[in-house]
């Protein structure tokens, strides 16, 4: 597969992942599927916008750049080899790095939140974090320490786990595009197939 075709494939995969990341982060603002009257009762990590910024917005731009490579024919700008493919592939590499950093941010925020557990109303009548060092992950009986919002533990655990997986996949895809983009920049893309009268690598 040509490096441009590979980039387009990666871009098409990143778009739905970014959308799912956005949705997962938005749902975290409704712990247990309920509206919270006091925003301070939400877990701190929800406000870090890992899914909205990291896996969402910062991933949309690289994905669009990767998909935009389909507008560059493999001869550059209609036979002008000086503009087009190599520069486009180099630019996609820079955006892939941005995407990797965004996905990494979302991945780290999600991992920290999963280990920390959700903020909830505890038996002592205060709001806080009843779990320590991910102990609730091994002992589901501890989940009862969170009295409100109801089902906040599985809610946060599920959504942050989704963000963790999405962030991990996005990091891998962006890393692949960094390598792919460098290959496209240094070695050129596919052989031209008669487009604009050209016949050779760009």
From Swiss-Prot:
This is Transmembrane 4 L6 family member 4. PANTHER family: TRANSMEMBRANE 4 L6 FAMILY MEMBER 1-RELATED, TRANSMEMBRANE 4 L6 FAMILY MEMBER 4. Regulates the adhesive and proliferative status of intestinal epithelial cells. Can mediate density-dependent cell proliferation. Residues 1-9, 70-93, 180-202 are cytoplasmic. The chain crosses the membrane at residues 10-30, 49-69, 94-114, 159-179. Keywords: Glycoprotein, Membrane, Transmembrane, Transmembrane helix. Disulfide bonds: none annotated. InterPro entries: L6_membrane. It is a multi-pass membrane protein. Belongs to the L6 tetraspanin family. The gene is Tm4sf4. Glycans are attached at residue 156. It is found in: Membrane. It comes from Mus musculus (Mouse). Residues 31-48, 115-158 are extracellular. It comes from the Eukaryota. One of its GO terms (cellular component) is membrane.
């Amino acid at each position: 597969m040509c490096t441009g075709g590979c980039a387009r494939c990666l871009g098409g995969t990143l778009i739905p992942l970014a959308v799912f990341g956005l949705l997962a982060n938005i749902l975290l603002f409704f712990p247990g599927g309920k509206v919270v009257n006091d925003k301070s009762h939400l877990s701190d990590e929800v406000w870090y916008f890992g899914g909205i910024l990291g896996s969402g917005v910062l991933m949309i731009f690289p994905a669009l750049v990767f998909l935009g490579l389909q507008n560059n024919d493999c001869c550059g700008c209609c036979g002008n080899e000086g503009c087009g493919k190599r520069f486009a592939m180099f630019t996609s590499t820079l955006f892939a790095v941005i995407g990797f950093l965004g996905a990494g941010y979302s991945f780290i925020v999600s991992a920290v939140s999963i280990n920390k557990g959700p903020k909830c109303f505890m038996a002592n009548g205060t709001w806080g974090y009843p779990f320590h060092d991910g102990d609730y992950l091994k002992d589901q009986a501890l989940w009862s320490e969170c009295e409100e919002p109801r089902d906040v533990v599985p809610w946060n655990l599920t959504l942050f786990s989704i963000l963790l997986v999405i962030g991990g996949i996005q990091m891998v895809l962006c890393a692949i595009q960094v390598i792919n983009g460098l290959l496209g920049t240094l070695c050129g893309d596919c052989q031209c197939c008669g487009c604009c009268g050209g016949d050779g690598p760009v």
